[in-house]
């Protein structure tokens, strides 16, 4: 039968019909929205469906359910060819700044948007939930964001704002009209409450009847027979069929064709593995592949059923069927719970997950263990197979023949006497790739505890999903008892072997997990047998073991934010000290805020793609561009030979714009391809072939130490008599601590647009950078023109965190060269994997310490040698090391001290500035040895910390006097507000009663110096224009990256000029308004630029004074007009430099810092000793921010910094190969904290009555200081591990053990030594290369 074929794509976007006659299967919805439709609210954050910045809502008529359905998707993975006859809603389609949707309004007014780059995606996730359920529960709201990431806020304000939609306890914002208000949950009565950061009563109510309707044209097509779709692109053909007959015919004709439903796997392979599939078949319309049927054996799911449907059907079955029939269903549901975000589960199919045959699949081990049955078909044949150990014959292979397809899968009902569990351990619970997954099933002989069937299946333990076929048969007919447990564990340890260089690494951890999972399964079954009155046959469960079977659940959140209200009588127009929302919050929430890549494309614009080294250290022997030139749209390939000025660049002139003869790291920029589109530039860049001659490479800190490979002389501070101090000490402890690096993971990657002006060498650049001055000067030097020909503009950034302070110039110089060479505008926005590969991150540190102390815990001597991995250029590494050594004392007075620092020169991408700038590393080392002092002395750690704490007027080890030392106040307040002593007793009680779960509690202080340590950078400038209508245009030297700097500066100007903030506007930061600016860094930008603005405003006010005296009853506008008509200038510059700064390392004298910021955090955690997973139960923070300029922004900075620190110290881990290649290049492999990672109880209090006389309006810096407080989580984890080690008889349990940072599940599990870790201890054979190395 011949069917009609359609080659015209029809869909709707925000209610408008789109007809695309030339649909390209390689074009994603994200590209189409941004480039073709100009809808730039939807952002590119990662390109792999891992961050949610591109989230949009899809609506379609579901013919099986006979209703309109709404679901969220990742536009970056959604092919436009899959959108025929559906409706797409983007953030622009639900509201705008003239009329915000309630979702947009609430995230803006609750201060849930900082840099704003992630905001549209989060808005659309929430909007989609409300379209499906206008009155969701708190849990449903939190689950809606499993596929979204935010790097700025710390998530609390987003959740708090959106919980106002919940029917079961939304926040009232402290208004007192909700019994579930999180502020009323605090037990602390020692601090007076403050008014709320926002008032939910101001929010518009949600009215579901006012939402846009589903396009009637599409509704009319619901019963129309579907026609085959065929779209042919430049390289790929897409065919969407609606009958099984068509599909099987096509598969017979084209056995290599790929079947795509959600594109969550194929899309990744095409983008990141450069795989090309010339024919793609979409079977999403076929009835047999999308149907669900309840049969006698179980529930049958069509292979194209999305996982969200599987989840929904299984949930209904669990709710309605007897418990004994749903054991398998609950196991599958547990895996789906953590599988991925809604955006992926809405489109990814169950069949796709099976056929992908991933060795680390979440579902395949569970389905294999469950006795799932699969139906396969090809033209003319159909067969049914069990999904057993034979189904996956090898890596990414199944037993399907090339022309076969998977039709359906039956997930079976469980039988009487059958028990089932599913397990998964990853770096992060939410939306993470598993390290190990498992499905476990046992069937007992009727009325006994004798094993009739046992199935133990694992992912992550081989190149395929495996079943423990050697171990399980030996257990048949055995009783479920301790003897069986020991036999199975011994068998698994022997059977499930991993080579030391196994992909993914973590060999001992993964092997231990298999035993831990079975032990959990054993205990779970034991509990259920007890409930079935069979306990006597198998033994009684130890009550302290019971919690080992409990999964970490999401508990109701309890968040508190306390701050000092403004004085009574302060003018309503004076916004200083008030929780004013971010100036751009409404624009960010509506998608109207313009970021660099959102700037409309120029008519003749070109695209650039970098070509980088694949070797860590090598000579460049040849560059072949012949294949690149064959790509359509190719324009040119740029190398060092094309640079008209200097190819030498970098802070210390030790870098190149393009590598010339030699590369010194993987990711070293060799050249750049320029083409007509980003896609063509990408393809052409892949076509550039480079041959190398390898040279010896230095990758790790240890390699550098061994080879004496360092940058410059050592940094050194010494005070007192170290030899005498150690000789007088009662105890001396020595050790090492390694602190891993960290990726910035700003949601907006590096982006530059260069526009040549066509005369006198002028060029205008739009750059996502924190450092306009260096961007300007580096480009001018490269082009061989004066700085005054280059104008650099920054509207806003989608996050920075130090990563755009210097490394942005790597991209901007290349783009500027391309614009110079072609005479046309050129744009480049790095893909996430490129950005992570090229731009470096936080410096890894290795510290070797020796501390001397008395029995009382008093520190008398300290020596620390710090080593950092600087990478292939010096960049800012020296200043970072200096700050680390400045902060090696943290908050403690140490009479005899020596700190040294060496920067290792290695063949890695240069590491650079990152929030904290070396301070967190120096302070973590301090708290590490401090905790060891407490353990050695047998004293409470909080007592030892308090005993050694500085006092007012003390001199630091670098001889700066501490004035206004509020840290003891912060400490005492945190001890009280956290109920530390009572909770410490509760933790000890919990640990006595639970063997396999342990809790830890720790309180940590911080003292952070404020100023650039390079003293001349401590300057700020401003330009203030007052127009004749009284409006003010404000410009200053700082850039906005989400920290609220522009908002605070408007507040400063408003108070200074005594006018409303509504009259003041900031357009951008640019080099042609405020020249020679310092980078927006060091937490000093509000201090420097705020004072400069104040000075400029005072100049304006002085000029207006005569007119105010002449007309005292006049208005601001009248005084301004009078000044104008009197020919008085209404424009003024302001300048400020921080006084009395300057430090000499030679004499250990002077003041490196203007003042210090202080804070204290108390955190409680619970660890799962069997898996290494942990849950952050509660954090209390007391932070001294002086007299806050804006409590909402400051609390947001405290929370955001803390959560970023939580990632640094417990989660984020960079993996490099021994050859220096980065494995972790995106959100699928590199995990930052997610919504579910933050403390369940998160309480932040700004210290009251502590004005800071050294900064604008008595405020203090806040961006960096709170980050280190997240180490309280790290040390709470370490305390919990210590309790676990004591439980399991480690003779050294109450002494010292190693825990490097970050405290990942692998490190936690391996540190909780027990019988399972002993069974799996292997060690690495000599001369064996591991999968990754500790850099």
UniProtKB/Swiss-Prot annotation:
Could you describe the post-translational modifications of this protein?
Subject to partial proteolysis; this alters the enzyme from the dehydrogenase form (D) to the oxidase form (O).
Record keyword Protein transport present: no
Recorded superkingdom: Eukaryota
List residues of the 2Fe-2S ferredoxin-type domain: 7-94
InterPro entries attached to this UniProt entry: 2Fe-2S-bd, 2Fe-2S-bd_dom_sf, 2Fe-2S_ferredoxin-like_sf, 2Fe-2S_ferredoxin-type, 2Fe2S_fd_BS, Ald_Oxase/Xan_DH_a/b, Ald_Oxase/Xan_DH_a/b_sf, Ald_Oxase/xanthine_DH-like
Q: What induces it?
A: By interferon.
Enzyme Commission (EC) number: 1.17.1.4, 1.17.3.2
Cite the binding residues for substrate. Answer: 805, 883, 917, 1013
The UniProt entry, under SUPFAM superfamilies, shows: 2Fe-2S ferredoxin-like, CO dehydrogenase flavoprotein C-terminal domain-like, CO dehydrogenase ISP C-domain like, CO dehydrogenase molybdoprotein N-domain-like, FAD-binding/transporter-associated domain-like, Molybdenum cofactor-binding domain
Q: Where does FAD bind?
A: 259-266, 339, 349-353, 362, 406, 424
Q: Which GO terms describe its cellular component?
A: cytosol; extracellular region; peroxisome; sarcoplasmic reticulum
Role according to the record:
Key enzyme in purine degradation. Catalyzes the oxidation of hypoxanthine to xanthine. Catalyzes the oxidation of xanthine to uric acid. Contributes to the generation of reactive oxygen species.
* Family to which this protein belongs: Belongs to the xanthine dehydrogenase family.
Q: What is this protein called?
A: Xanthine dehydrogenase/oxidase
Q: From what organism does this protein derive? A: Mus musculus (Mouse)
Q: What are the top taxonomic ranks of the organism? A: Eukaryota, Metazoa, Chordata, Craniata, Vertebrata
């Amino acid at each position: 039968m011949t069917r009609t074929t359609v080659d015209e794509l029809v869909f709707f976007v925000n209610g408008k019909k789109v007809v695309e006659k030339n649909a390209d299967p390689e074009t994603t919805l994200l590209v189409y929205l941004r480039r073709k439709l100009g809808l730039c609210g939807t952002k590119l954050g990662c390109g792999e469906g891992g961050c949610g910045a591109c989230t949009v809502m899809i609506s379609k008529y579901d013919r099986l359910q006979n209703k309109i359905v709404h679901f969220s998707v990742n536009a970056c993975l959604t092919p436009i060819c899959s959108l025929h006859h559906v409706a797409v809603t983007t953030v622009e389609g639900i509201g705008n700044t003239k009329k915000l949707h309630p979702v947009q309004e609430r995230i803006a007014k609750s201060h849930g948007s900082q840099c704003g780059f992630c905001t549209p995606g989060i808005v659309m996730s929430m909007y989609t939930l409300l379209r499906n359920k206008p009155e969701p529960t708190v849990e449903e709201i939190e689950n809606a964001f499993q596929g979204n990431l935010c790097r700025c806020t710390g998530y609390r304000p987003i959740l708090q704002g959106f919980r106002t939609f919940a029917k079961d306890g939304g926040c009232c914002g402290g208004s007192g009209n909700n019994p579930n208000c999180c502020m009323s949950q605090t037990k602390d009565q020692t601090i007076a409450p403050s008014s709320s950061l926002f008032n939910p009563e101001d929010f518009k109510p949600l009215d579901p009847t006012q939402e846009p309707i589903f396009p009637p044209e599409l509704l009319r097509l619901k019963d129309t027979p579907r026609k085959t779709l065929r779209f042919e692109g430049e390289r790929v053909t897409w065919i969407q069929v609606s009958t099984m007959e068509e599909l099987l015919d096509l598969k017979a004709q084209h056995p290599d064709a790929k079947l795509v439903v959600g594109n969550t796997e194929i899309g990744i392979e095409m983008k990141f593995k450069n795989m090309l599939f010339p024919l793609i078949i979409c079977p999403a319309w076929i009835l047999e592949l999308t149907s669900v049927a309840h049969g006698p054996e179980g529930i049958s799911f069509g292979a194209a059923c999305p996982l969200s449907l599987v989840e929904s059907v299984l949930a209904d079955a669990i709710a309605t069927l007897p418990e004994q029939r749903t054991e398998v269903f609950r196991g599958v549901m547990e895996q789906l719970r953590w599988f991925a975000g809604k955006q992926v589960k809405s489109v990814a199919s169950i069949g796709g997950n099976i056929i992908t045959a991933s060795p680390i699949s979440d579902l395949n081990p569970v389905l294999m263990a469950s006795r799932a049955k699969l139906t396969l078909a090809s033209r003319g044949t159909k067969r049914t197979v069990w999904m057993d150990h034979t189904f996956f014959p090898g890596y990414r292979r199944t037993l399907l023949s090339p022309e076969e397809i998977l039709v359906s899968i039956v997930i079976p009902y469980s039988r009487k006497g059958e028990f089932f569990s599913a397990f998964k351990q990853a770096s992060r619970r939410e939306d993470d790739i598993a390290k190990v997954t498992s499905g476990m099933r046992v069937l007992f002989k009727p009325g006994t505890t004798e094993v009739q069937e046992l199935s133990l299946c694992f992912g992550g333990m081989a190149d395929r999903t495996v079943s423990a076929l050697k171990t399980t048969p030996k257990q048949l007919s055995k009783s479920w008892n301790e003897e069986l447990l020991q036999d199975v564990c011994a068998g698994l340890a022997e059977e499930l072997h991993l080579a030391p260089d196994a992909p993914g690494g973590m060999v001992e951890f993964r092997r231990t997990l298999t035993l831990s999972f079975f032990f959990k399964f054993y205990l779970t079954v034991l509990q259920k047998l007890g409930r079935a009155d069979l306990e006597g046959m198998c033994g009684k469960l130890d009550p302290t073991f019971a919690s080992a079977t409990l999964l970490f659940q999401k508990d109701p959140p309890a968040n508190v934010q306390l701050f000092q209200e403004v004085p009574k009588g302060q003018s309503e127009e004076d916004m200083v000290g008030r929780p004013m929302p971010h100036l751009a919050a409404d624009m960010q929430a509506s998608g109207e805020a313009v970021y660099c890549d959102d700037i409309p494309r120029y008519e003749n614009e070109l695209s650039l793609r970098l070509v980088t080294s694949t070797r860590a250290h090598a000579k460049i022997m040849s560059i072949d561009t012949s294949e690149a030139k064959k790509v359509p749209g190719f324009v040119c390939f740029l190398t060092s030979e094309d640079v008209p000025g200097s190819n030498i660049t970098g802070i210390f002139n030790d870098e190149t714009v393009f590598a010339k003869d030699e590369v010194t790291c993987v990711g070293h920029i060799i050249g750049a391809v320029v083409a007509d589109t980003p896609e063509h530039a990408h393809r052409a860049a892949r076509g550039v072939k480079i041959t190398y001659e390898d040279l010896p490479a230095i990758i790790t800190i240890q390699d550098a130490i061994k080879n004496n490979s360092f940058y410059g002389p050592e940094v050194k501070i010494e005070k007192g008599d170290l030899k005498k101090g150690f000789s007088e000490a009662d105890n001396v402890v020595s050790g090492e601590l390694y602190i891993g690096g960290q990726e910035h993971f700003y949601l907006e990657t590096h982006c530059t647009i260069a526009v040549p002006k066509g005369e006198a060498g002028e060029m205008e650049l739009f750059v996502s950078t924190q450092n306009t001055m260096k961007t300007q000067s580096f480009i001018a030097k490269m082009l061989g023109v004066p700085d005054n020909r280059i104008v650099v503009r920054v509207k806003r950034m989608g996050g920075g965190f130090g990563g755009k302070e210097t490394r942005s110039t790597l991209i901007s110089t290349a783009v500027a060269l391309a614009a110079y060479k072609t005479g046309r505008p050129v744009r480049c926005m790095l893909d996430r994997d490129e950005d992570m590969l090229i731009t470096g991150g936080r410096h890894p540190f290795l510290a070797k310490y020796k501390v001397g102390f008395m029995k009382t815990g008093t520190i008398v001597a300290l020596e620390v040698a710090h080593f950092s991995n600087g990478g292939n250029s010096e960049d800012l590494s020296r200043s970072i090391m200096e700050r680390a050594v400045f902060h090696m004392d943290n908050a403690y007075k140490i009479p005899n001290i020596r700190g040294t620092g060496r920067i290792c020169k290695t063949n890695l991408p240069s590491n650079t500035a990152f929030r904290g700038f070396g301070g967190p590393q120096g302070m973590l080392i301090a708290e590490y040895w401090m905790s060891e002092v407490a353990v050695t002395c047998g004293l409470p750690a909080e007592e030892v910390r308090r005993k050694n704490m500085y006092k007012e007027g003390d001199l630091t080890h670098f001889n700066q006097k501490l004035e206004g030392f509020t840290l003891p106040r912060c400490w005492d307040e945190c001890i009280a507000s956290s109920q530390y002593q009572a909770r410490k007793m509760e933790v000890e009680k919990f640990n006595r009663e639970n063997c396999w779960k342990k809790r830890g509690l720790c309180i940590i202080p911080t003292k952070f110096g404020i100023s650039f340590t390079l003293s001349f950078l401590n300057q700020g400038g401003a330009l203030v224009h007052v127009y004749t209508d009284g409006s003010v245009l404000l410009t200053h030297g700082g850039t906005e990256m989400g920290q609220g700097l522009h908002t605070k500066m408007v507040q400063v100007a408003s108070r200074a000029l005594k006018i409303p903030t509504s009259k003041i506007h900031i357009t951008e930061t640019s080099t042609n308004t405020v020249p020679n600016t310092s980078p927006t860094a060091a937490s000093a930008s509000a201090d420097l630029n705020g004072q400069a603005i104040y000075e400029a405003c005072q100049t304006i006010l002085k000029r207006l004074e005569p007119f105010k005296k002449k007309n005292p009853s006049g208005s601001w506008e009248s005084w301004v007009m009078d000044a104008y008509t009197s020919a008085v200038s209404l424009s003024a510059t302001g300048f400020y430099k921080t006084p009395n700064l300057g430090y000499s390392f030679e004499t250990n004298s002077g003041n490196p810092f203007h003042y210090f910021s202080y804070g204290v955090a108390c955190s409680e955690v619970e660890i799962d000793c069997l898996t290494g997973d942990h849950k952050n139960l509660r954090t209390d923070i007391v932070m001294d921010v002086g007299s806050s300029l804006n409590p909402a922004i400051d609390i947001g900075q405290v929370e955001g910094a803390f959560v970023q620190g939580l990632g640094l110290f417990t989660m984020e881990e960079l993996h490099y190969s021994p050859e220096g290649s980065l494995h972790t290049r995106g959100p699928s492999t590199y995990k930052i904290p997610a919504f579910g990672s933050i403390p369940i109880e998160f309480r932040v209090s700004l210290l009251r009555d502590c004005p800071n006389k050294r900064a604008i309006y008595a405020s203090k810096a806040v961006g960096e200081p709170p980050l280190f407080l997240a180490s309280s989580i790290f040390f709470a984890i370490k305390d919990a591990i210590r309790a676990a080690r004591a439980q399991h008889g480690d003779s050294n349990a109450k002494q010292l053990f190693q825990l490097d940072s970050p405290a990942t599940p692998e490190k936690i599990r391996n540190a909780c030594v027990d019988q399972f870790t002993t069974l799996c201890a292997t060690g690495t054979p000599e001369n064996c290369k591991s999968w990754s190395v500790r850099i």
